[in-house]
Amino acid sequence: MILEHHFASLGHAFSSKTHVQPLIEQRLVEFNQSLASFLSIDIKSTETKCILSGEEALPYSLSMVYAGHQFGGFSPQLGDGRGVLLGEVRGQDGLLYDLHMKGAGPTPYSRRGDGRAVLRSCIREYLASEAMTALSVPSSRALALYDSREAVYRETPEAGAMLLRVAQGHIRFGHFEYFFYQGKQAELDQLIEYCLEHYYPECLATDSPLESMLTEVVKRTARMIAKWQAIGFQHGVMNTDNFSFTGETIDYGPYGFMEDYEPDWVCNHSDHEGRYAFSRQPGVGLWNLNCLMRCFSKHLERDQLIAILQCYEPELQTHYDSLMMSKMGLTSTQDVHELLPALFTILAAEKMDYTVFFRLLSHYEQGEFAFLLDEVIDRERLLAWLERYEVARDKGGLLWSQASASMLAVNPKFILRNYLAHEAIVAAEQGDYLPFRRLLNVLTHPFGEHSESESLAQRAPEWGKSLEVSCSS
């Protein structure tokens, strides 16, 4: 494994030298071999094993400093309070990827915290990041999970753990906010050049590299959120310090995958105002991008920044329309626009499971209404919608069998339901990782039938519907 240290070369203004502090009696309990192969990482190597686990102190490992708007309020200095960037490795695609350890121990930015993570949160992030990747959502990845015999104190004592994460970059909107509001123009310029060189090199050849890069950041963010909305994912804490400059989903905390369709659903129990509700995510994405654009007010004219931001909504809408068109087996965005509002009204009124409905729709054969109508109380309303849907689907010119096959490839049978994560966590805390691995297997292959794992596709039982997650998750 060849570990590079490009971010460290930026200097002390951007980070602090920090070593991973291994946990008491830590052990490797899950390793992502396919991701490791892509990154040319050999876990059988003793040296590599010691580097990845933090048992070997690295000369250039670091924790990053940044700022951020948290629930609308600005925090001038945040930073990696429990994370350490080990360095970067090159993937088989020739790109560099960060290796970042969560739960690595205290850093200069821990703000009186212990810098640790608990097994519960590490399992949730491992499952979510791999599930999102399988659903074609840009996301950080999970490379390795370590548990331990070290107690970490939250509301109650919990098992300490560490998660080794992989992403194209860990630079956040908040990195730019930190230097802008500190008035550190030279460092801000340095960060801009770094991002152009490492993440957006294609923009260097344009007439206005910064303008081109920011336009691409806006579009990537729009496409990412469009995918969140299409699969029913809610991030939970859409602060600017949790938004990636490379357009990846990062920092999985009190997230959730929608079960009963509820547009104003709030998955984070700590979000008392519903600021980051499911239906508000597209608007929050634009708000965060507006915060980011302010940081370049000395580089570009106001009209240029506004024009860049105006790319967001059409990019999000176009991508969302395309995704929903595929989910519904249609070929016309006009049909999507005409059918979707009425469908969402039905799903909300019936408290229909979002994922289950679209999977059932994928199996729908022309004129065979019964199995779908059995899912609802108001059969006449759904029947009227299905009749309109049939007309739209016929217009596409595809055979119904072809359309169904395409729909089954984009409508998952398996999502990460909160109660399933809870069951996997409870078992793992007792030393049994089999439920975690069974769940991980279907989440990384969510479109298959997996008849032997049918129970993992079931809707939440009553006890599972009352589970809550918060920022401590």
From Swiss-Prot:
Under which main EC class is this enzyme filed? transferase
Alphabetized, the UniProt keywords read:
ATP-binding, Magnesium, Manganese, Metal-binding, Nucleotide-binding, Nucleotidyltransferase, Transferase
Which chemical reaction does it catalyze?
L-seryl-[protein] + ATP = 3-O-(5'-adenylyl)-L-seryl-[protein] + diphosphate; L-threonyl-[protein] + ATP = 3-O-(5'-adenylyl)-L-threonyl-[protein] + diphosphate; L-tyrosyl-[protein] + ATP = O-(5'-adenylyl)-L-tyrosyl-[protein] + diphosphate; L-histidyl-[protein] + UTP = N(tele)-(5'-uridylyl)-L-histidyl-[protein] + diphosphate
Is Heme set as a keyword in this record?
no
Report the domain of life of the source organism.
Answer: Bacteria
HAMAP family of this UniProt entry? YdiU_SelO
Under the heading Pfam families, the entry gives: SelO
Q: Where is Mg(2+) annotated to bind?
A: N242, D251
| Record-listed E.C. numbers | 2.7.7.-, 2.7.7.108
Q: What residue ranges are annotated as transmembrane?
A: none
Q: What are the positions of the active site?
A: D241
Q: What is the lineage of its organism?
A: Bacteria, Pseudomonadati, Pseudomonadota, Gammaproteobacteria, Oceanospirillales
- Point out the gene that encodes the protein: ydiU
Q: Which GO terms describe its molecular function?
A: AMPylase activity; ATP binding; magnesium ion binding
Question: Which purpose does this protein serve, as stated in its record?
Answer: Nucleotidyltransferase involved in the post-translational modification of proteins. It can catalyze the addition of adenosine monophosphate (AMP) or uridine monophosphate (UMP) to a protein, resulting in modifications known as AMPylation and UMPylation.
Residues binding ATP, per UniProt: G79, G81, R82, K102, D114, G115, R165, R172, D251
Keyword Cell membrane recorded: no
Name the family: Belongs to the SELO family.
Please give the cofactor(s) recorded in the UniProt entry for this protein. Answer: Mg(2+); Mn(2+)
Q: Quote the protein name from its UniProt record.
A: Protein nucleotidyltransferase YdiU
